[in-house]
Amino acid sequence: MGFTHRIRVRYADCDMQGVVFNPVYFTYVDDAMDQWLASVLEGDYLQQDFDYMVKKASIEWDSPARHRDVVELRPEVTRWGRSSFDVRMHMSVGDRTIGVAECVFISIKPGEHETPTPVPVPEKVRAALG
């Protein structure tokens, strides 16, 4: 089994309905991506001449996560392009699927956040993420 990132739902993550507020799931996905990259690239990937940005993201929701639930996020690369890659992020609480995020990321030069220029995804990143 691949990488799994676990996040305990905080009170502040929930809306008036008592469930995780929709945009918070994107924060969970972002945190899982950061942790996944840090684990497979063994440290600060920005110091390894790699950075990335979200080009597109969507979530198909299935069921709610609530305060104190532990959300498990399991990423997998589903497509490689020259300077981009797609990731599917499975989200669950226990055996219950709560949703699936689909994201397109672009590889950029570290430090070019104002006017990012897409650059080829480094081979070490491709190898590490599979």
How should these model regions be labeled?
Residues 1-55, 110-130:
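Hot-dog-fold acyl-thioester-processing enzymes
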Residues 7-9, 59, 75, 89:
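Preference for bulky hydrophobic residues occupying beta-strand positions
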Residues 36-72, 76-84, 98-100, 106:
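Hydrophobic beta-strand-centered segment that forms part of the acyl-chain substrate-binding groove
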Residues 3, 66-67, 78-130:
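HotDog/MaoC-like acyl-thioester-processing domains
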